[in-house]
């Protein structure tokens, strides 16, 4: 923020915070009406137990900052499973989503608001790490892919993202009920876009 007073810093800190802090991201996307898994900010074991009692166990617990590729993420069957995580601030608790697939919307946005999108890709995660990407996405309805792209572009616009944005999403439901839920954001060249190095005109 101090540097931004002297020179243009892109993406701006006001956008980057939503890729750095998962709680801030969930709060902002929920305020925007973007579809997300059920979630809660939990300050202690009692709040985690209450959330688990409401949505059912197991659930996902994440550290708001510093997690990537499966780090800082746990499947909790009870508060005891993350008992060592307390003491560094609140945690993000989320419903364990019964997804049928995963996709990623990848786009680039200029400071003036122009957006170019690559085809929505389907992804396969192994132990929290992206292991396979297929573009265009397979196994989902064209309408679902179009909705995923619209969501990605809306997030980029409303957060004021510049540069590359990847929006990872879960695919849930079947047939006409198929839809996407936003999992995480990455405001950087992302592994779901590595295919563009050889598979697209621009990368």
Language-model-detected regions and their locations in the chain:
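Active-site nucleotide/adenylate-binding loops and adjacent lid/helix of ATP-dependent enzymes
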Residues: 18-155
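Short, flexible active-site loops
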Residues: 128-137, 186-197
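Conserved metal-phosphate-binding beta-hairpin within the catalytic cores
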Residues: 160-194
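Short beta-strands and strand-loop turn motifs
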Residues: 10-12, 61-64, 189
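Thr-Gly-centered strand-to-loop micro-motif
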Residues: 12, 94, 167
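Internal, well-ordered alpha-helical scaffold/interface segments
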Residues: 146, 150-153, 167, 180-183, ...
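Short, intrinsically disordered, charge-balanced linker/junction segments flanking boundaries
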Residues: 4, 193-203
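ATP-binding N-terminal substructure of ATP-dependent carboxylate-amine bond-forming enzymes
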Residues: 1-15, 31, 46, 50
């Amino acid at each position: 923020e101090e540097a931004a007073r002297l020179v243009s810093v892109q993406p701006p800190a006001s956008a980057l915070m939503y890729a750095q802090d998962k709680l801030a991201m969930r709060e902002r996307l929920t305020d925007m009406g973007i579809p997300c898994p059920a979630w809660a900010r939990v300050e202690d074991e009692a709040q985690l137990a209450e959330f688990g009692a409401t949505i059912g166990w197991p659930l996902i617990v994440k550290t708001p900052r510093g997690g990537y590729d499966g780090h800082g993420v746990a499947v909790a069957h009870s508060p005891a499973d993350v008992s060592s995580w307390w003491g560094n601030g609140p945690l993000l608790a989320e419903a364990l989503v019964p997804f049928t697939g995963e996709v990623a919307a990848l786009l680039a946005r200029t400071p003036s608001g122009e957006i170019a999108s690559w085809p929505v890709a389907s992804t396969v995660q192994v132990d929290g790490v992206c292991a396979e990407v297929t573009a265009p996405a397979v196994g989902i309805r064209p309408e679902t892919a179009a909705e995923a792209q619209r969501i990605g572009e809306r997030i980029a616009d409303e957060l004021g993202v510049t540069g590359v944005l990847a929006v990872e999403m879960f695919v849930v439901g079947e047939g006409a009920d198929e839809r996407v839920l936003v999992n995480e954001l990455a405001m950087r060249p992302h592994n779901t876009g590595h295919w563009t190095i050889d598979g697209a005109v621009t990368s």
